[in-house]
Amino acid sequence: MLHTLMNEAKAVVVDIGGFTADYLLMNNGKADLSSCDSLENGVILLYNKIRSRGNAELDLLLDEGDVDAILTGKQTQYPPSVVRLVEQLAQEFVNDLFSTLRERMLDLRYCTVVFVGGGAILLRRQIEAYGKVGKPLFVSNINANAAGYEYLYRLEAAGR
């Protein structure tokens, strides 16, 4: 995947984690540190919103495992109304995140977007359904960040 990004005129890496969603713009394979930030848009906010609305509107006590099962398309015992609510709120979460990125002058329609992090894996269907991401790539390895840091460490250590 690194070779793919090196040949792209413009790419954005979006890491959707528990507490934050981080992004980094890459131009011609090089990080543009003037266009990177950490947004307080992690999936824990989504879990809390789903649990709150589920309790208020449907008198349900959903936990994170329930939400994960619904969002990953696993068979659950929940009625269609619960599944619809969870998927609707997840789609709104993704739409809001991408609107925030657009406000920061990142138009995802015309670039490669690499999605990493557990939140990106969880929300893959909603990200793909958004329909305004030019070329989405998903890193499904939950340990990709650690592997990347290990790679950078080895490069740094070899240079000493």
Give the role of each language-model region.
Residues 13, 38, 113-115:
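Short glycine- and Lys/Arg-enriched binding-loop motifs that mark or flank ligand-binding interfaces
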Residues 14, 41-44:
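Aspartyl protease active-site motif detector
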Residues 28-41, 134:
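Short helix/strand-bridging catalytic loops that position acidic/His residues to coordinate divalent metals
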Residues 15, 37, 140:
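Conserved acidic E/D residue at the C-terminus of a beta-strand in Rossmann-like folds
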Residues 2-31, 50:
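Gly/Thr-rich phosphate-binding beta-strand-loop-beta motif of the actin/hexokinase/Hsp70
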Residues 2-8, 43-160:
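Helical "lid/coupling" subdomains associated with nucleotide-phosphate turnover
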